[in-house]
UniProtKB/Swiss-Prot annotation:
SMART domains: Fapy_DNA_glyco, H2TH. The lineage of its organism: Bacteria, Bacillati, Actinomycetota, Actinomycetes, Propionibacteriales. Belongs to the FPG family. Monomer. NCBIfam families: fpg, PRK01103.1. It catalyses: Hydrolysis of DNA containing ring-opened 7-methylguanine residues, releasing 2,6-diamino-4-hydroxy-5-(N-methyl)formamidopyrimidine; 2'-deoxyribonucleotide-(2'-deoxyribose 5'-phosphate)-2'-deoxyribonucleotide-DNA = a 3'-end 2'-deoxyribonucleotide-(2,3-dehydro-2,3-deoxyribose 5'-phosphate)-DNA + a 5'-end 5'-phospho-2'-deoxyribonucleoside-DNA + H(+). It comes from Nocardioides sp. (strain ATCC BAA-499 / JS614). Binds 1 zinc ion per subunit. This is Formamidopyrimidine-DNA glycosylase. A zinc finger (FPG-type) spans 245-279. The gene is mutM. Pfam families: Fapy_DNA_glyco, H2TH, zf-FPG_IleRS. The active site is at P2 (schiff-base intermediate with dna), E3 (proton donor), K61 (proton donor), R269 (proton donor). CDD domains: EcFpg-like_N (cd08966).
């Protein structure tokens, strides 16, 4: 699934190519990607036709395009979604689901939503130009200037759950997915199962700093692409996968100590870590169940 760096690369591309464009026509080629829009495919298309795109914004893994009437086109890429800016005469992609014909952007372009697995989707958010209410509950991401480091540290240290699980909690911190959680934990030398309440404030701040570092590095390389499913708006893949230290490197030598990287199952996915640099936490001692009998 695309994470913060990949989604930010797409947002930046949309900002370059579609700002100021008017949506002249909307073709919904499959109803599933617009299933979250209660208007249905025809109502979705009608709500967008004639509207001008004012900006391109993101919160976590969600994208939205504010429109000139105060509404917004809200999108999530899911597992395999792509937002492509194409010339009108470009051949249709195999999994093209929604097409927006644009006027006034790069001498006429199309914004295409392509999604093989169709876990992603588009919808029109009424009054959602500033922040769609559908995603208002999602926390800010670590690259957001208004992200509250102190609050994040306090909340992590109040919880007994493993720190990787917390990094993936979009209500606590958004945009961090499996890849960058593993990479940040490797850089910080912290095991993902270490409970938050067993980390010092300094260690949590170090982990947050590493999360920012790895995401900024990924942004600089266009994101991480393991296959053709993640591309930017021009159809180009990122290459940060060449710079990964832990994720996807099971059995390969840790670049710090030489120990083989280990993979374990985690929340219907996989975690990758170095068992030496990131030692597993000791189990908590069970509370005594003995009952004292009075003399």
């Amino acid at each position: 699934m695309p994470e913060l760096p990949e989604v930010e690369v797409v947002r930046a591309g949309l900002e370059r190519h579609v700002l100021g464009a008017t949506i002249a026509r909307v073709d919904v080629l499959h109803p599933r990607p617009v299933r979250r829009d209660l208007r249905g495919p025809a109502g979705f298309a009608a709500a967008l036709t004639g509207r001008r795109i004012e900006a391109a914004r993101r919160r976590g893994k969600y994208l939205w395009l504010p429109l000139d009437n105060g509404d917004a086109l809200l999108g999530h890429l899911g597992m395999s979604g792509q937002l492509l800016v194409q010339p009108p005469d470009a051949p249709d992609e195999r999994h093209l689901r929604v097409r927006l014909a644009l006027e006034g952007a790069d001498e006429g372009r199309e914004l295409r939503f392509v999604d093989q697995r169709m876990f992603g989707g588009l919808s029109v958010s009424a009054g959602g130009a500033d922040l769609p209410p559908e995603i208002a509950h999602i926390a800010r991401d670590p690259l957001d200037p208004e992200f509250d480091d102190d609050d994040f540290v306090r909340r992590v240290r109040r919880r007994t759950s493993g720190v990787k699980r917390q990094l993936l909690d979009q209500n606590l911190i958004s945009g961090v997915g499996n890849i960058y959680a593993d990479e940040a934990l490797w850089r910080a030398r912290i095991h993902g199962e270490r409970p938050g309440d067993r980390l010092t404030a300094t260690r949590v701040r170090e982990l947050l700093a590493h999360a920012r570092e790895v995401m900024l590095a990924a942004l600089g390389e266009g994101g991480t692409s393991f296959d053709a499913l993640y591309v930017n708006v021009n159809g180009e893949s990122g290459y940060f996968d060449r710079s990964l230290h832990a994720y996807g490197r099971e059995g390969e030598a840790c670049e710090r100590c030489g120990t083989p990287i280990r993979r374990v199952a985690f929340m219907n996915r996989s975690s990758y870590f170095c068992p030496v640099c990131q030692p597993a936490p000791r189990r908590r001692r069970a509370a005594s169940s003995r009952v004292r009998v009075p003399d």
